[in-house]
Design a protein with these regions (language model features):
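Surface-exposed acidic/polar loop and edge beta-strand patches at domain peripheries
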Residues: 1-137, 145-282
Length: 282
């Protein structure tokens, strides 16, 4: 295993690599994990941007930028006022404030440590990355640097390079649609998983991903809090099984994003463990 510095798409980057995995981190762009290559199959796991990266402007709209790879969402996702325990109301930015600011980075033997300080609220956010064989370990530490409690939510925002053979496996038989949908109906509709009924009472597979020609996107959450912190899906035409494991006591919610060309004309999906249900801290 080796860790080295270099350039990725014209940005200073840190690489961690062994016989199974090569990962690329761009500290300057919100600590983004830009690439994960599974070397035995020469397969890029993460959805890649179609245009060069641009340096984000703090407080700007998330969708104006690359929407690729893995970004950290904290302390919010939806734009929202923060009224809790502070004298002056502050507005939390779109998709949080971490993705649009440069992070610091250091190498500690076999680990990459990236960290950043909050802007609107007084906290520090640290992520520790380590690769062992064919596994990636992500550890997080959020430190409150103020004298008052800080409330917020964290979500893992990792866009994956899916295809029409991708299959999703979740530890549940019930999910909740969180977007109004021409297929799944109004937001907050309860559905069976993996097979439900669409608005025409036809069988609809929630565990599969359709063609990018469908020009639609769906998002749903596992119903209620997780009993088991795990989820997985197949990639690279069913040749690769990608598993996620996390502590369901600390991260009790799980969202699924399926983009079949409906958002920014892109084709990707995401498994999104989070500390709060959906995107609001209110």
């Amino acid at each position: 295993m080796r860790i080295f510095q270099g350039s990725y798409q014209e940005f200073d980057s840190i690489f961690i690599e062994n016989n199974h995995i090569k990962m690329t981190i761009i500290p300057e762009i919100g600590g983004k994990i830009a690439s994960i290559i599974y070397k035995p199959q020469a397969f890029e796991i993460l959805f890649q941007p179609s245009e060069p990266y641009r340096m984000p402007i703090y407080g700007d709209s998330f969708e104006k930028y690359d929407t690729s790879g893995i970004d950290e969402m904290f302390p919010n996702i939806d734009i929202s006022d923060y009224p809790y325990g502070i004298s002056n109301m502050v507005t939390l930015k779109d998709h949080g404030e971490l993705w649009s600011v440069p992070w610091g980075a250091s190498i500690d033997r076999s680990r990459i440590i990236t960290q950043v300080a909050g802007t609107e609220l007084e906290y520090s956010f640290k992520r520790i990355v380590e690769v062992k064989n064919n596994q990636i370990f992500l550890d997080y530490v959020v430190t409150n640097n103020s004298k008052k409690s800080i409330l917020g939510i964290w979500a893992f925002h990792g866009l994956l390079a899916c295809d029409e053979m991708t299959q999703i496996f979740l530890p549940t038989d019930k999910v909740i649609n969180v977007h109004d949908s021409s297929v799944l109906g109004k937001a907050e509709t309860l559905h069976s998983f993996p097979v439900t009924k669409d608005l025409q009472a036809r069988d609809y597979r929630l565990d599969r991903i359709g063609s990018p020609l469908l020009k639609k996107a769906e998002k749903y959450y596992v119903c209620g809090k997780l009993k088991t912190g795990q989820a997985s899906l197949t990639l690279n035409k069913n040749q690769l099984l990608c598993k996620m494991n996390f502590n369901e006591k600390k991260i009790p919610y799980l969202g699924v994003w399926i983009n079949e060309g409906g958002y920014k004309n892109q084709y990707n999906c995401a498994l999104e463990p989070s500390t709060g249900y959906y995107d609001s801290i209110m």
